[in-house]
């Protein structure tokens, strides 16, 4: 009989290599001319994760200087997408104690709670501008840009109303977007036409869903006392059990997950694999190790995360998704890669049995 020593299989990686790759990605990310919009929000979330994992204050100080420059230049109008930068505001406040960062985070919260367009049971409509671009549509992207941010803020501020709103967003995005037959997430849902529009299982949508769901239990104290958390657990379990089978031989995931002719996409691969680390199920370790090898091959010597698809609306057809360029450096690719590699470094601290 195997010995019960409390030890489970571990990840396979070179710590110095991962730290070096993180350093390269952070430095290259901070050379990008990102702004208050979601590319910066995801990128700088990753920089904050890198600081938390490595303890390298250079990373958070570089970010602090950049954000201070942004603040001096003035604040834009908020949308769901621009609320992604709220993650960095919370992290900078935790680091520095400077109320100006918390004040900006609170202004984003005020927008979400009092101005953002909603439909149905207070479900956030995905917005990318001050215009009503996508009437009564929910997108998986909103889970990262707004719901996860609201959850973090609610926990930090001990505000149960924010926590409840965040969990409500998760609950309804699961109900609207997850396919019960496959466990995979559609990119978007149109509440007016009552359909998923073109109806594809877009890779990055599944990364947004998986990653943010996997963070709930690690963010919310006594999460098991919130009924909607159990829906999140069930949803993530179903999704990861299905999605692991779609991993390619190179350890990656495709831009349309179940389309063998779609290209392998790195931001989706990072978000999905990071969710597996967070989940802690030992059955996923072999998939995580395979992903690490594949993702490392897609980071250039100067810290660019390669083969990341450009900004993607809910496209009209399969070719629309296949045709999105992956030639350029993207903030979300940098940020999700940093989040993934940071999870690897923190694995011994966050490992669990995957139960919740």
Residue ranges and their predicted role:
Residues 123-189:
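Aromatic- and glycine-enriched pocket-lining scaffold segments that form the walls
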